[in-house]
Amino acid sequence: MKLTIIGFGEAGRAIAQGLSEEAQAPEISCFDIKTLDPSQSDTISQAARNLGVRNCTTLEQAVDGAAFLISTVTAGSALDVAKAVSSLRPSAQAFFDMNSVAPGTKRTEAELLEAAGVAYVDTAVMAPIHPRLHKTPMLLAGPNAETFAAVLSAWNMDVRVVGEAVGRASSIKMLRSVMIKGLEALTAEMGLAAEKAGVSDEVINSLNASFPGIDWAERTAYNLERMTTHGIRRAEEMEEVVKTLEELGITPELSEGTVRRQRRFGESKVILNSDELSLKQSAHKIFAKMDKF
């Protein structure tokens, strides 16, 4: 059984790594648009070799003969990938869209893939892809979700069907992200301001007392690292969240602010390691690199 992963970044590689360790592992191929960039192609090729994955140099080569397709690209590229795949009229049975995009975007993608004869499965990844890899909890939705959930379950993936309507899984993910990505932005704003004011210890102690069970210094340092590492991708996801809220008639005031802050941190080029750096250390690395926070 052949599986192709389109988009071989952090998520695509993690899924490939996990699946490759399964007894009933599919034969995995991948394609990433970065393969077409001479400055990045070697990185993609090496990552594929390390995982025993066949690296394809064109999308057409990647989808040819694949029974199942998984899309793990950026939110801004998800619809373009669906259009490109559907234009190839692939023989694949199903297309699992694991990208964080608005329900309306997924419904548009579904129309394209279904018209090309490929079942579309709205798939939402509900936790960080590490450390659980392919076993990270996922929600599935769509008229064929039950059928293809069995395929993923056979590979020991942790999936749950939440309905037959495309967009239902995405809605859950998008609205959860209002809180998750918004909390990242809030803690960044709080943590950096508190450190600038010289009162971070007092602020963190107060938060720890109000919300026992959460180490706010550790959480804030972790969130800062996530934003500087993945802020551009997170900003794209939050733009899809904004679309989702607007589709529901909810004014996305806070989420629009989250977009701006995530993108600013993602573009900062600051490199943090939350396992090694405290909140204070992370904050001062940011102060040294960024003019606007």
Cite the ranges covered by each PLM segment.
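Rossmann-fold NAD(P) dinucleotide-binding segment
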Residues: 59-120
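Helical "substrate-binding/catalytic lid" subdomain
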Residues: 172-277
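NAD(P)+-binding Rossmann beta1-loop-alpha1 motif at the extreme N-terminus of oxidoreductases
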Residues: 1-65, 89
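Conserved beta-strand segments of alpha/beta enzyme cores
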Residues: 27, 52-54, 94, 119, ...
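Rossmann-fold dinucleotide-binding core
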Residues: 101, 106-181
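Short, basic/aromatic-enriched C-terminal tail that caps enzymatic domains
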Residues: 275-293
